[in-house]
């Protein structure tokens, strides 16, 4: 029997995932007490119905599960069944918006605000997140995309959506992009702003790009940063992440960060990475 544990943060899409698994023929059960897991498995094994796939939703609502999830997984393994743990996540901003739209209270802490509930839940589930088979960030997903991803995961990875990389340049002067997964500060590179003939232009212009790339430290940095991204991207894909935001920052977001982002974009696009590029602050501070 194949068993999938659906867990993660409240508001992250677990209910949608369960509906997708039900459509695939899974027998789904929500909020099963830990003390009944072994009994439930035995009942399914001896049932007259041919149940081969089971999904159990187990999360913060069951404090016994949070304290003893290792015992749950051990009991399943001892019974000779395979188990996958799908951990659903989203950014705090997205979770807060979802709770606001549905006007629901956060279930983790009675009487707490939604942000307080999210922080508490993240802390309580941190250990479970570390051992998950897949971590699914639903921040940028619609319902259709989430269902397709879940179905792909239970089929052993077949049909899993390709991760999208969103590469953007920005200026630290205007604040960090809140949605960033990775941030690289390139303010250590030579600055075309201090070259009078280059100042009016941007990192999209050939003269600025040649100036930035014409220094040895830029070439060495870019080589190492590309290598790091090539190492990280497959790991994020295996984690189940569908969207990765990489932000490159300089002082004003017009020269160095734009030039470096363009170099990275062209490099990874030639290697068939699903990548998009934006320049958040390129037109700011022009007058």
From Swiss-Prot:
Record-annotated disulphide pairs: none
Taxonomy, superkingdom: Bacteria
Pfam families per the UniProt record, alphabetical: PapZ_C (PF22740), RapZ-like_N (PF03668)
Keywords: ATP-binding, GTP-binding, Nucleotide-binding
InterPro entries: P-loop_NTPase (IPR027417), RapZ-like (IPR005337), RapZ-like_N (IPR053930), RapZ_C (IPR053931)
Gene3D superfamilies: P-loop containing nucleotide triphosphate hydrolases (3.40.50.300)
Binding site residues for GTP: 59-62
Binding-site list for ATP: 8-15
GO MF, any single term: GTP binding
NCBIfam families registered for this protein in UniProt: PRK05416.1
PANTHER family: RNASE ADAPTER PROTEIN RAPZ
Family classification: Belongs to the RapZ-like family.
Functional note: Displays ATPase and GTPase activities.
Protein name from the UniProt record: Nucleotide-binding protein Gbem_0872
Organism of derivation: Citrifermentans bemidjiense (strain ATCC BAA-1014 / DSM 16622 / JCM 12645 / Bem) (Geobacter bemidjiensis)
């Amino acid at each position: 029997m194949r068993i999938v544990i659906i867990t993660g943060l409240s508001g992250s899409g677990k209910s949608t995932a369960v509906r997708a698994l039900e459509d695939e023929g899974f027998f789904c059960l929500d909020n099963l007490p830990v003390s009944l897991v072994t009994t439930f498995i035995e009942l399914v094994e001896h049932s007259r119905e041919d149940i081969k796939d089971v999904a159990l939703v187990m999360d913060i609502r069951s404090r016994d599960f949070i304290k003893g999830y290792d015992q749950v997984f051990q009991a399943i393994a001892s019974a000779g069944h395979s188990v996958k743990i799908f951990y659903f996540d989203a950014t705090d901003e997205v979770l807060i918006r979802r709770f606001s739209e549905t006007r629901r209270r956060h279930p983790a802490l009675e009487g707490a605000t939604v942000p307080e509930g999210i922080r508490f839940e993240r802390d309580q589930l941190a250990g479970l997140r570390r051992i998950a088979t897949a971590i699914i960030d639903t921040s940028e997903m619609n319902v259709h995309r989430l269902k397709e991803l879940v179905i792909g995961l239970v089929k052993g990875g077949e049909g899993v959506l390709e991760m999208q990389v969103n590469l953007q340049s920005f200026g630290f002067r205007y604040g960090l992009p809140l949605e960033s997964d990775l941030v690289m500060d390139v303010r250590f590179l030579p600055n075309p702003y201090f070259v009078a003939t280059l100042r009016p232009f941007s990192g999209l212009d050939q003269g600025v790009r040649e100036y930035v790339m014409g220094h040895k430290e830029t070439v060495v940095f870019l080589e190492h940063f590309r290598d790091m991204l090539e190492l990280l991207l497959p790991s994020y894909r295996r984690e189940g992440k569908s969207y990765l935001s990489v932000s490159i920052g300089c002082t004003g977001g017009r020269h160095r960060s734009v030039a470096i982002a363009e170099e990275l974009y062209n490099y990874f696009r030639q290697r068939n990475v699903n990548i998009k590029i934006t320049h958040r602050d390129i037109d700011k501070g022009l007058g």
